[in-house]
Amino acid sequence: MDVTKIKDPSFLKDLSYEELDGLSQDIRTFLIEKCAVTGGHIGANLGVVELTIALHKVFNSPKDKLIFDVGHQTYIHKILTGRAEQFDTLRQYKGLSGFPKLNESEHDVWEAGHSSTSLSAAMGMAKARDIQQQHYEVVPIIGDGALTGGMALEALNHIGHDKTNMTIILNDNEMSIAPNVGAMHNMFGRLRTNSNYNRAKSDIDLFLSKLPGGHKLRDSADRVKDSLKYLVVNGIFFEELGIKYIGPVDGHSYKELEEALLTSKRIDGPVIVHVITKKGKGYHPAENDKIGTWHGLGPYKLETGEVLKGSAQGPSWSQFFSDTVQSFAERDKTIAAITPAMPVGSKLTKFQKELPQQFFDVGIAEQHAVTMAAGMAANGMKPYVAIYSTFLQRAYDQMLHDVDRQNLHVVFGIDRSGLVGADGETHQGVFDISFLTHMPNMTVMMPKDENEAYHLLYNAFYEYEGPIAIRYPRGNGYGVKIDSIPNSVVRGDWEVLHEGTDVIVLSFGPTLKLIEAVREELLKEGVSIEVVNARFIKPLDYHYLAAAAKRNIPVLTVEEAMLSGGFGAAISNHYSDLDLDVHVKRIGIDDEYIEHGDVSMLLDDIGINKANLIHEIKQLAISHEES
C-alpha cells in the first residue's frame, strides 16, 4: 500500500489480519527510508506499528481519545491520520513535528514530550467525559519505562481508587531510552514470562461457564482466583490497585491485540492491557540495539544503519563533561554520577561500566535523582547529576527545597542547554537560567570552550561550596587543547576577551564565537566593541559591572535563553536597583515557545545571528553618540 494515500484510519476496520500484516511492512519500510534522511525516534516507532494499527482499528479516533505518553512513538499514528506526505519535513523548520501537535490534526488530542503524563491527562479527560455525560473511550498508551515515573504512579493510584473507566495500554519493550532499571522493571519481567496466571484464569472461567448456574459459581470463585494469582505470579500490582489486568499480549500479533482490546472495552472500570513489543522491530541495526543508541538519532545509511557524522572538530559536549567527571571520580571515590534514565544521551555509559559503584541510573525519576543527590551531599559525597535542561524543570522543587535551601554541594551538569533543534518546544533548554538564578545559594556557569569547562568543573568539585549548575549545549565542542593542570577561577569572575570603547557585549557559552566574528566585521566599519565572557551567570561580576557603569557606554546582553528572568534581566535589575543610568539592550527569547527546526534557523528567528547583532550594536553606538 502507498501509505501517503492514507487520509484517515477508518479503512482499517475492513482489513483482514493478512492485509494488516502487509500494511505493517509497508509502514516500516516507509519509516526506515524517511528517517534515514531526516533522523528521528525510529526505534520506538518500529516497535509499535502493529499496536498503533490495532488501536486505530478497534477504537474510533478522534472521538475516542488516544493519548500517547512522551509522544515520540506517534509516527505511525501520524501516518494513519493522513500525514505521511509530510514526512519529508519531519522535525524540520516549519515541518511535521516529531511529537503530537494539537494544531496538526484533530486526532492529536494531547501534546507531550516529557514522560509519564498520559495517565493524569487520561484521568482528566475521563472525568470530563463522565461529568458531562458523554460517551467515548479514553486510551492512554504508556511505556514500561515511563510507568516508573512518579507522576504515572500517582495517577495509577487515583485511577484504581476511583475505578474510572479507561483502557491503559502498557507498551512493554524493556527500554525507555536506555534499558530500564528498578523494581517496577523487574516486576514487568516476571509478568512478561508468566502466562500461567492468565491461562489458569481463562480455564477456570471456561469450565465454570459450562456448568448449570455457572455464572454464580464463577462469581463465587473470585477468591479462589485471587489466591491463584499469588501462587502463580509473584504479585499482581495492578489488580491490587483496583485495575483489571489483561496480558501479557504479543504486541506484534493482530489477533491477540484485537482480542485483548475488545475485551478491555467490555470491562467496566479501569483496565490495563500489557503488550510486549520489540523496540526497533523490522530493522536489524535498531532491533539489535541493547543500550538505546537507536532511540533517537540523526540521518543514517539505509543499508547499514551507520549514523552519518558531521564535521565536528571536537568531542560532543556531553562526552567531554562525562569523561572529565570520570577522570576526577577515578581519583576521588566521593564523586558519584547520577542520571535519570539518560546514560546514553549524557554519554555516561563508560563511567557506568568502569565505575559501577559510583554510578546510579535511577530511571525516569528526575525528582528522586535530585533529592538522592542531596542526601549523598549531606553525608560527605560530591554527587554529580547529569541531566538535560528540559528534564531539570521536572525537579524544580527538589532543587529549591532539598538542595539549595540546605546549601548542599551538588554539582549539576545541565546538558542540552540552549536551543536543541529538531525535538522542538518540549525539549528546548531555555528556561533553566530563569528558574535557577533566583535560588539564593545557586552558582550558575557556562563555559566558552572545553578548556574552560575543565577548569570550571574542577572548581565546582573542589573550590566552590553549595549547589553548582554548569550549563553546556547540545552538539560538539571545538577541539581546543586542554591544560594539564586545573586552575583556580574566582567565583563570579568574568573574562574580558576583547577590549572596546563603543559598546560592551556580555554573553556566555557558544554565543561568544558568534560575537567575536561580529566584532571583526564591526572593526572594519570603525565600531569597537568590548567582548566579555560572562561565564558566571550567577553570581554576576559586580566589580566589572561597577567599572562598566563609570564608562558611560551602552551594554548589550545576548543569551540563548528566555529574556524573562534571564541573564540580561539580572544586569538591568542590578543597575536599576543602584539607580545607575546604564543603557542595557537585551537579545534573547521573548515570551514564547520555540518550535522545532534547525538551530541556525531558530537563532535567526530570535535575532542571534551576525546580521542582526551588527545592526543592533551599530544602533546602540549611534544612539549613544547622539545622546
Swiss-Prot record:
**What is a biological process (GO) this protein takes part in?**
terpenoid biosynthetic process
Specify one Pfam family. Answer: Transket_pyr
Q: Which domain of life is it from?
A: Bacteria
Residues that coordinate or bind thiamine diphosphate: 72, 113-115, 145-146, 173, 283, 366
PROSITE patterns from the entry? TRANSKETOLASE_1
Which GO molecular function terms does the record list? Answer: 1-deoxy-D-xylulose-5-phosphate synthase activity; magnesium ion binding; thiamine pyrophosphate binding
Tell me where the transmembrane regions lie.
none
Which cofactors does this gene product need? Mg(2+); thiamine diphosphate
Q: Which GO terms describe its cellular component?
A: cytosol
Recorded E.C. number(s)? Answer: 2.2.1.7
Catalysis: reaction(s): D-glyceraldehyde 3-phosphate + pyruvate + H(+) = 1-deoxy-D-xylulose 5-phosphate + CO2
Q: What pathway does the annotation place this protein in? A: Metabolic intermediate biosynthesis; 1-deoxy-D-xylulose 5-phosphate biosynthesis; 1-deoxy-D-xylulose 5-phosphate from D-glyceraldehyde 3-phosphate and pyruvate: step 1/1
* Keywords annotated in UniProt: Isoprene biosynthesis, Magnesium, Metal-binding, Thiamine biosynthesis, Thiamine pyrophosphate, Transferase
Enzyme type, top EC level: transferase
The Swiss-Prot or TrEMBL record describes its family as follows: Belongs to the transketolase family. DXPS subfamily.
Q: How does it assemble?
A: Homodimer.
Name it: 1-deoxy-D-xylulose-5-phosphate synthase
Task: Please report the organism this UniProt entry assigns to the protein.
Answer: Macrococcus caseolyticus (strain JCSC5402)
What are the top taxonomic ranks of the organism? Bacteria, Bacillati, Bacillota, Bacilli, Bacillales
